[in-house]
From Swiss-Prot:
Residues 470-484 have a biased composition (Basic and acidic residues). It comes from Bos taurus. This is Regulator of G-protein signaling 9. Residues 460-484 are annotated as: Disordered. Residues 299-414 form the RGS domain. Photoreceptor outer segments. Residues 30-105 form the DEP domain.
């Protein structure tokens, strides 16, 4: 059986029809398919008819599924018009009894995508009106009158086509005429379903373009493709064993911190109605949990991503007289993700504070990066300081981060960290005894608390005499000659 698919790939949520069609093809196999035979329906012997029970039995045996699953799948096949009932056409369900069904011809399958237009439906209704001598169902009469008003300018063409099709149908033998009428009726029951029925083919608006369509190649597109393949050749290839080993190592390291896989302590607030978890893991809590502090040692990004970890790291950098590095990194993050209407003002402020000669919090970056940054500041945008930010980030990662993990500040934080104990869920069968679930802390409030903490840190004065005495002591040690 040769079946053409016309544009099915761009229809959303309809890819499963291909699988149904593959199953229907197997059902029509003369050797291993469903048993079919001639059946008499209303004095007419219909060829290739089958019973609903035979279809369900074949589906169960073919797919190794239960009777309930086979019934559900059979209903889908009937609703989408691949099998249609002969005795009760409007009942689009598969009955598990001796009710007769027949396979729909592939021309009327949904994936053929010839549009069910108003003109075709009007011709079908006009043909039925001629055949039944005006005796149509109520919803068909309404549709007939509506289409008569809608396409009145071509109604003569509709009537002429209906008469021609009716005349051609009368020339066929009785069996073929009855089979074609059943197929056509089943098609329109699916595509123009009666009132109250579920329209299974309603998938929304068509896409303007087909994403799978071959686009015309231009000089620009070919150049982009060549550039892409050249870059792909330059990439270093990694063995799959190395990649999989990295994934396994990462999973083992982070499994204890996964709230879904390992649970969360003291308890899940959405289940137990206990907000202690949110209180212990607030952004700038005084004493963090042990699991949170241990996570800072996984990698530098985990430390700098956590507001509390960043606060502790800033305290360490200030003792090493390099707190301006983290301050510059935070200012660059605010430039990228903050209010974009103030990009120019923020960029100028960052330059005066960190990059200008003699700046109050001057940072040490190489000359090449400084030249790139200064040139970019002539036309500032949110990513103008990326080169300098990356340089400072790598400097902190390779130099300061390792010393921080060995410092007394981190060890003291780890020693004081809280290790919460798990709590049991308290529930009550009486609704009035249950506490109302609370929502998580508001991000606005947490942001305000974080900004207030930053303001307090910025307001703290530095004892300049203490700093100068340390610098003098260092210079004095350098000048003293080593003992002989």
């Amino acid at each position: 059986m040769t079946i053409r698919h016309q544009g099915q790939q761009y229809r959303p949520r309809m890819a499963f029809l291909r699988k149904i069609e593959a199953l229907v093809k197997d059902m029509q196999d003369p050797d291993t398919g469903v048993r079919v035979q001639n059946q008499k329906v209303k004095v007419v012997s219909i060829p290739h008819a089958m019973t609903g029970s035979d279809v369900l039995q074949w589906i169960s045996q073919r797919l190794w599924i239960s009777g309930l699953e086979a019934q559900n799948l059979g209903n889908f096949i009937v609703k989408y018009g691949y099998i249609y009932p002969l005795q009760d056409p409007r009942n689009l369900t598969l009955k598990p009894d001796s009710s007769l069904y027949r396979f729909q011809t592939p021309y009327f399958w949904p994936t053929q995508q010839w549009p069910a237009e108003d003109v075709d439906y009007a011709i079908y209704l006009a043909k039925r009106n001629i055949k039944k001598k005006g005796i149509l169902e109520e919803y068909e009469k309404e549709n007939y009158n509506f289409l008569n008003k809608k396409i009145n300018y071509k109604w003569d063409f509709v009537i002429m086509q209906a008469r021609e099709q009716y005349r051609a149908g009368k020339e066929r033998n009785k069996v073929d005429r009855c089979a074609l009428d059943c197929q056509e009726k089943a098609y329109w029951l699916v595509h123009r379903c009666p009132p109250g029925a579920n329209n299974v083919l309603d998938y929304g608006l068509d896409r303007v373009t087909n994403p799978n369509e071959d686009q015309k190649q231009t000089v620009v597109s070919v150049r982009k493709e060549i550039m892409y393949y050249r870059q792909a050749l330059m990439r270093s290839t990694v063995k799959s064993s190395v990649s999989l080993g990295g994934i396994v190592k990462y999973s083992e390291q982070f499994s204890s911190n996964d709230a879904i896989m390992s649970g969360c302590l003291p308890s899940n607030p959405w289940i137990t109605d206990d907000t202690q978890f949110w209180d212990l893991n607030a952004k700038l809590v005084d004493i963090p949990t042990k699991m949170r502090v241990e996570r800072w040692a996984f990698n530098f990004s985990e430390l700098i991503r956590d507001p509390k970890g960043r606060q502790s790291f800033q305290h360490f950098l200030r003792k090493e007289f390099s707190g301006e590095n983290l301050g510059f990194w935070e200012a660059c993050e605010d430039l990228k993700y903050g209010d974009q209407s103030k990009v120019k003002e923020k960029a100028e402020e960052i330059y005066k504070l960190f990059l200008a000669p003699g700046a109050r919090r001057w940072i040490n970056i190489d000359g090449k990066t400084m030249d790139i940054t200064v040139k970019g500041l002539k036309h500032p945008h949110r990513y103008v300081l990326d080169a300098a930010q990356t340089h400072i980030y790598m400097l902190m990662k390779k130099d300061s981060y390792a010393r921080y993990l060995k410092s007394p500040i981190y060890k003291e934080m780890l020693a004081k960290a809280i290790e919460p104990q798990g709590t049991t869920r308290k529930s009550s069968s009486l609704p009035f005894m249950r506490r109302h679930l609370r929502s998580s802390p508001s991000p606005v409030i947490l942001r305000q608390l974080e900004e207030e903490a930053k303001a307090r840190e910025a307001a703290t004065t530095v004892d300049i005499t203490q700093v100068m005495s340390k610098l003098d002591r260092r210079s004095q040690l350098r000048k003293e000659p080593p003992p002989k």
